[in-house]
Structure formats: structure tokens, C-alpha cells
């Protein structure tokens, strides 16, 4: 007798592709410039993107890592704006903040508590 696996949730392949591209971007940044900051940021953000893509595929109600990921990405690019005054980083950071505000209006206080907990280091695995 076969067991029923339950409802199947499709994998978020776009998130996994983005995670792979972010990691490759970090590697190519290291190869071109020789900066250690580029691969570390690439691997960090690709890890967060992979986590964000795999969570809803296991449980469709878990979408809370996406705002934390976008917030950290916006904070990273905001730091680049302050040090380099790069226009691309400014536009990308503003776009990330708009996405966070849109998700904030959809999910309300749930997102704000998760972001606050992640900033304080209170998130548990």
C-alpha cells in the first residue's frame, strides 16, 4: 500500500536560479576585482534567496524570510550608496524598500516583528 505524500507544492525554481546567479556574481566579482567582499556578499545573499525559495515549497504558509532577505539586501546596497555614491545601488535599494513596504501592507505586524527580531539576533533556527 502506498502512502499519500499529501498536497504537492511546486518548487520556486526562479528563486533557486536567482540564488545560483547571486553566487556566480560573487565569484565573478572576486575574479575580476580580487575583492573578498564580493563573494562573501554573493554567497550570503544567495543563501538567503535559496532559503526563501525552499521554505514555501515545504510549507506554503511560510513566507516570512522574504522580507528579512529583502531588508538585508537593501541595507547592503544602502551601505554601498554611502561609500561609493553609485546610482545603480541607489535605485536597487529604493526598489527593495518599496517591495518591503508592499509586503508590509499585505502581512502587517507579522513582518515587522520578524525584521525586528532578526536585527536583534533573536531569530531561532
Curated annotation (Swiss-Prot):
Pfam families (alphabetical): Tmemb_14 (PF03647)
Key word Glycoprotein present: no
Gene: TMEM14EP
Any one Gene Ontology BP term: regulation of heme biosynthetic process
Bilayer topology annotation: Multi-pass membrane protein
Name of the featured protein: Transmembrane protein 14EP
Gene Ontology cellular-component terms listed: mitochondrial membrane
Transmembrane segments: 9-29, 81-101
Main location (coarse class): membrane
Keyword set, alphabetical order: Membrane, Transmembrane, Transmembrane helix
Entries under InterPro entries matching the protein: TMEM14, TMEM14_sf
Family: Belongs to the TMEM14 family.
Organism: Homo sapiens (Human)
Subcellular location, record wording: Membrane
The keyword Transmembrane helix is assigned to this record: yes
